């Protein structure tokens, strides 16, 4: 459970960054 918790902590921000990056690219284009 501890490892899964760490994965969630790392994955959550990464997915938000990827989503923000996609929205930024679509906004620019």
From Swiss-Prot:
Key word Repressor present: no
Catalytic activity: diphosphate + H2O = 2 phosphate + H(+)
Chief location of this protein within or outside the cell: periplasm
Organism (species): Nitratidesulfovibrio vulgaris (strain ATCC 29579 / DSM 644 / CCUG 34227 / NCIMB 8303 / VKM B-1760 / Hildenborough)
Protein name (database record): Inorganic pyrophosphatase
E.C. number: 3.6.1.1
Localization per Swiss-Prot or TrEMBL: Periplasm
GO cellular component, one term: periplasmic space
Claim: Hydrolase is one of the keywords in the record: yes
Function: Inorganic pyrophosphatase is an essential enzyme for the activation of sulfate by sulfate reducing bacteria. This is a high activity pyrophosphatase.
Molecular-function annotations in GO: inorganic diphosphate phosphatase activity
Keywords, sorted A to Z: Hydrolase, Periplasm
């Amino acid at each position: 459970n501890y490892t899964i918790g760490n994965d969630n902590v790392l994955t959550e921000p990464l997915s938000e960054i990827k989503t923000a990056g996609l929205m930024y690219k679509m906004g620019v284009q």
